[in-house]
A protein has these predicted regions:
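Glycine-rich adenosyl-nucleotide cofactor-binding module
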Residues: 148-163
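Structural beta-strand/beta-sheet cores of well-ordered domains, especially the beta-sheet scaffolds
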Residues: 8, 98, 143-145, 152-154
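Non-catalytic nucleic-acid substrate-recognition regions in nucleic-acid-modifying enzymes
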Residues: 2-130, 138
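Short, surface-exposed recognition loops or helix-turn segments adjacent to catalytic cores
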Residues: 133-146
Length: 163
């Protein structure tokens, strides 16, 4: 198991307010994966745990849609999101990857004030500007940058597993 502890983000189904959170934590407990709950947001659980927790939860969960490594957390305005992206060492994050894609997902109407397609395009342009050798691949990217918009927060992540 990869023992590197990171903040991980799980995008959950929104059909029940508590069951997906319980399912995720039960899977971690039953597999003896040490974790610390950081925060619960609408359809999102943030924990501190080994990176391999993403794969374990993805393999066993029915109410988890995506498991990611949290790279940045900020206010949900485009300006704050783009600043957070630019503040990251994207060359280090993509050092073993040759291609990337960007997706933005708003949950429970928290992204109504945003133009998702434009935000994806802007984030992609900033990443491409910072990492000149990486190419955009919308079909089968080596790295998927996934931003979740929930409550008043944007969570900029590197996707590990999609269910």
């Amino acid at each position: 198991m990869d023992d590197h502890i990171k903040e991980l983000v799980f995008l959950l189904l929104g059909s029940d307010p508590s069951l997906p959170f319980s399912e995720c934590e039960s899977i971690l407990d039953s597999n003896n994966i040490p974790f610390k709950e950081i925060k619960r947001l609408d359809q999102v659980l943030i924990i501190s745990a080994p990176i391999d927790a993403c794969k374990v939860v993805a393999r066993q969960a029915g109410m988890v849609r995506r498991a990611c490594i949290l790279l940045a957390k900020c206010e949900k305005t485009p300006e704050h999101i783009l600043r957070a992206v630019c503040d990251l060492d994207l060359n280090e994050i993509l050092k073993t990857k040759t291609s990337f894609a960007v997706r933005v997902k708003g949950v429970r109407g928290h992204s109504r004030s945003l133009c998702i397609a434009e935000l994806e395009k802007e984030i992609g342009a900033r990443i491409k500007e910072a990492v000149k050798w990486a190419r955009v691949d919308l079909e089968k990217p080596d790295a998927l940058f996934f931003t979740v918009i929930t409550n008043d927060t944007a969570l900029f992540c590197l996707s590990v597993e999609e269910i």
